[in-house]
Amino acid sequence: METLLSPRALSPPLNPKPLSLHQTKPTSHSLSLSKPTTFSGPKHLSTRFTKPESRNWLIDAKQGLAALALSLTLTFSPVGTALASEFNILNDGPPKETYVVDDAGVLSRVTKSDLKKLLSDLEYRKKLRLNFITVRKLTSKADAFEYADQVLEKWYPSIEEGNNKGIVVLITSQKEGAITGGPAFIEAVGENILDATVSENLPVLATDEKYNEAVYSSAKRLVAAIDGQPDPGGPTVKDSKRESNFKTKEETDEKRGQFSLVVGGLLVIAFVVPMAQYFAYVSRK
């Protein structure tokens, strides 16, 4: 009995902790190189990945919904469509088989065919390439000139590439256009013809929504200048003078005289007739 109830005999089953430490000691020794006190990296990674997964799921869901909403907005809104068209023109680069990027969809097949014949002949003879771009509306740039410069720099990044290139941009909603190009192109056309084409051919005809004529007449005028031919000139500006609703001075004076006569006659009748009736009544008595 004493042997069974002695403290030494009871110590192993009542105190298993030292035995547990002794058994796990080799494992602890083998992982001593990855202790948090030695390397802070595993500690931070451990903390990051032990966060509740439900919270990360909610954050990802919110970000996904926000991205979806933004994508739908850009896809179906007019601003998003216009913005996409502008950047598509920049990223797609210059047209290879034609000389026209009709993003606005306002040019006919006949106009595109005539432009291809005219501009391909120009490129073959003069080694100058001229491209036309139509856009409905600008949202990324303030005006057509800024956008034209942006297209030129994007399509032809170096001076050597853009030296003999020219770009004509027509904004249909704003009824305006712009022309830009490399040094060789600008010198071949001349500043006067460039200014005249931008201020006459493009805006005047675009205002009447004659986009085909605006583009083709501009091309012919630029090609004529490059070939040294006489300037065909711009379109004839129609006299849009409207009839005024206001009377002239002469008409006003004439109406005023007639009005005075009528008023004077009415006043005479108003005073004379009662007086005549009064005197007639008195004379009878």
Curated annotation (Swiss-Prot):
Biased composition (Polar residues): 22-40
Main location: plastid
InterPro entries: TPM_dom
Biased composition (Basic and acidic residues): 238-251
Region feature (Disordered): 1-48, 228-251
Keywords: Chloroplast, Membrane, Plastid, Thylakoid, Transit peptide, Transmembrane, Transmembrane helix
Protein localization: Plastid, Chloroplast thylakoid membrane
GO CC, alphabetical: chloroplast; chloroplast thylakoid; chloroplast thylakoid membrane; nucleus; thylakoid; thylakoid lumen
Swiss-Prot/TrEMBL GO biological process terms: photosystem II repair
Topological relation to the membrane, as annotated: Single-pass membrane protein
GO molecular function: acid phosphatase activity; mRNA binding
Pfam family, one: TPM_phosphatase
Regions crossing the membrane: 259-279
Family: Belongs to the UPF0603 family.
UniProt name for this protein: UPF0603 protein At1g54780, chloroplastic
Organism: Arabidopsis thaliana
